[in-house]
């Protein structure tokens, strides 16, 4: 029988009890990998990839303080401003609409909402982010959107987004294989498939990860075998 799970302030969806176990396990840590990626590449890399040119200077200056609050996990201040000189990612995205800085502000804002447990707002804001042809930020942003979909009960959309994130990461990697990001995204997709009792589809993903991403940590450590065994031993 399905159980009712509260994924947000006003969002109640019916999901199988197996899904409930998944979200109880991952609700607080579902975005840790994605947020870590954003934090690691914040600053110079983000600036060079997304914000350049004189017309972006003012917007990028506004972003800098927000990045500091974000890195310090002061997500409410990063999102809404500090009541002093910093306006917040939401206002930056609005005030500088159409700029690369505003696009990046939408990504940060979506991640702030996610970390605050406001998943519906996270979905809406992350959907505003426009991907670029980069190897890290855009795949991570797509994965973040996938996790936001999952936490609002849109499991099919979540699986699709996570698979797309892996494809995006692979497309910019040597030999079309991103051993750092893609296995993480695909394993999340497979676990969601398991929560839908689609064990065969999940098993195929796990086996594909083991075969394709041989140099990844999850394969090198034999962690992937635990996922495979979990299904095959049922």
Model-derived features: positions:
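N-terminal positive-inside, membrane-proximal cytosolic segments immediately preceding the first
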Residues: 1-36
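Short solvent-exposed coil/turn linkers within tandem alpha-helical repeat scaffolds
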Residues: 53, 93-102, 116, 131-139, ...
